[in-house]
A protein has these predicted regions:
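Residue-level recognition of pore/gate-forming positions within transmembrane alpha-helices
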Residues: 15, 19, 48-51, 86, ...
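Membrane-interface junctions at transmembrane-helix termini in multi-pass inner-membrane proteins
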Residues: 5, 133-156
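Alpha-helical transmembrane segments of multi-pass membrane proteins
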Residues: 52-53, 100, 115-140, 226
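Hydrophobic alpha-helical transmembrane segments
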Residues: 125, 155-205, 265
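Membrane-water interface segments that mark the loop-to-transmembrane alpha-helix transition
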Residues: 6-18, 45-46, 59-107, 122-125, ...
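Signature of the first transmembrane helix
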Residues: 3-65, 99, 103, 130, ...
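Helix-loop junctions and terminal segments of transmembrane helices
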Residues: 59-74, 146, 264, 268-292
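Interhelical loop/hinge segments that connect adjacent transmembrane helices in multipass membrane
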Residues: 1-5, 175-186, 197-242, 285-292
C-alpha cells in the first residue's frame, strides 16, 4: 500500500507540473499578439476531434490490455507473447475504418463548419495523423501500465507533451516557423512521447511484439471479443461526452467560443489529477488480483 501511495504522489506531482506548463501555454495561446482566438480554438477543436477518432478506433483494446496481461505473461514466453501485436492489429483495423468514415463524411464536416470555423475545414485532414499518434501512444501506455510504468506515462502525457507544445509555441512566436508548420508539429506531439515510451520499454527488454496467434489468444478468444465489444461502446460514449460541447460550439458559433470553453475545461480538469494518478498506478494491481 505504501508503494501505491508513493507512486500516486509522484504521478500527481508530474500531472500538476504539466498543468503549470499548460497554464503558460494557454497564456501564450491567448495573447492576441501571437495567436488569434480562432487559431487557439483550432488547436483545441483539432485535439478533441483527434481524441474522438482515437477513441472510436481503439475498439476497446486498452481494456483488453489491462485485463488480460497477467494471463499472457504467466503462460507465454516473451517472444511468443502476441498481446501487444493483437492490440495493434485491432487498433489499426479500427483506425483504417474510422479514417474511411471520416473521408466519406468530409462534405458534411465542410457544410457544418465552413461558415463559422473555416480554419477547422482548412486543417481537417490533420485529424488523421494526430488521431493515429494518440492511438499508438494509448495502446502502448495501456501495455506499459502492467510493468508499473504509471509514473512514467503520467510524466510523458501530462508534462512532456505540454513542454513540447511550449517549445513549438516559442518557435512560432520567434518567427522561426509559420503557423502551418506549427500545426504540423502540433499534430505529432503524441508521436514524440510514443517513441520515448517505446524506446524505454525496448531498452528494458519489455517490448514484445508478435503477430503469430498464441494459445492464450485462442483459449480466450470469445472473452476477448466480448470485452472489446462492450468497452468499445463505453469508450465511445465517454469520448463523445467529453468532445461534443466544443465541437458544437465550433460548428454553431465559431472557434473563438470553442477556445473559451476549452480554457474553462482546462481549469476544471485540474481537479481530476489525483484520480488520474490513482488509475495509472492501480490498474496492474487490479489486473493481477482479477486473475489470481
Amino acid at each position: 500500500m505504501s508503494q501505491i501511495r508513493k507512486r500516486t504522489l509522484k504521478a500527481t506531482w508530474w500531472i500538476y507540473t504539466g498543468f503549470l506548463i499548460g497554464a503558460i501555454n494557454v497564456y501564450l495561446f491567448t495573447n492576441l499578439h501571437w495567436f488569434s482566438a480562432a487559431q487557439y480554438g483550432l488547436t483545441t477543436s483539432l485535439r478533441e476531434l483527434s481524441m474522438l477518432v482515437c477513441g472510436l478506433s481503439a475498439l476497446g483494446v486498452t481494456s483488453f490490455l489491462y485485463k488480460f496481461f497477467p494471463y499472457y505473461e504467466d503462460n507465454l514466453a516473451p517472444q511468443k507473447n502476441d498481446m501487444l501485436g493483437l492490440a495493434l492489429k485491432v487498433a489499426l483495423f479500427g483506425f483504417i475504418a474510422m479514417s474511411s468514415i471520416l473521408y466519406i463524411l468530409k462534405p458534411l464536416v465542410i457544410r457544418k463548419f465552413s461558415e463559422n470555423s473555416p480554419l477547422l475545414v482548412e486543417y481537417f485532414y490533420y485529424i488523421i495523423p494526430m488521431g493515429f499518434c494518440i492511438l499508438l501512444f494509448q495502446v502502448l501506455e495501456a501495455y506499459s501500465y502492467s510493468f508499473g510504468k504509471g509514473v512514467l506515462t503520467s510524466f510523458l502525457k501530462e508534462t512532456l507533451v505540454r513542454f513540447y507544445t511550449l517549445v513549438i509555441i516559442v518557435l512560432k512566436i520567434a518567427g522561426i516557423i509559420s503557423f502551418r508548420s506549427f500545426m504540423q508539429l502540433f499534430t505529432l506531439q503524441f508521436l514524440v512521447i510514443f517513441i520515448v515510451l517505446a524506446f524505454i520499454l525496448y531498452r528494458e527488454k519489455k517490448l514484445w511484439v508478435s503477430f503469430a496467434t498464441s494459445r492464450v489468444t485462442k483459449k480466450f478468444r470469445k472473452k476477448i471479443i466480448a470485452i472489446l465489444a462492450f468497452t468499445s461502446l463505453v469508450v465511445f460514449v465517454g469520448v463523445l461526452r467529453s468532445s461534443i460541447d466544443s465541437l458544437v460550439l465550433a460548428s454553431k458559433i465559431n472557434l473563438e467560443n470553442a477556445a473559451f470553453f476549452a480554457f474553462a475545461t482546462y481549469l476544471a480538469s485540474i481537479m481530476q489529477a489525483p484520480f488520474r494518478s490513482i488509475v495509472a498506478i492501480t490498474i496492474p494491481i487490479l489486473s493481477r488480483a482479477w486473475k489470481d
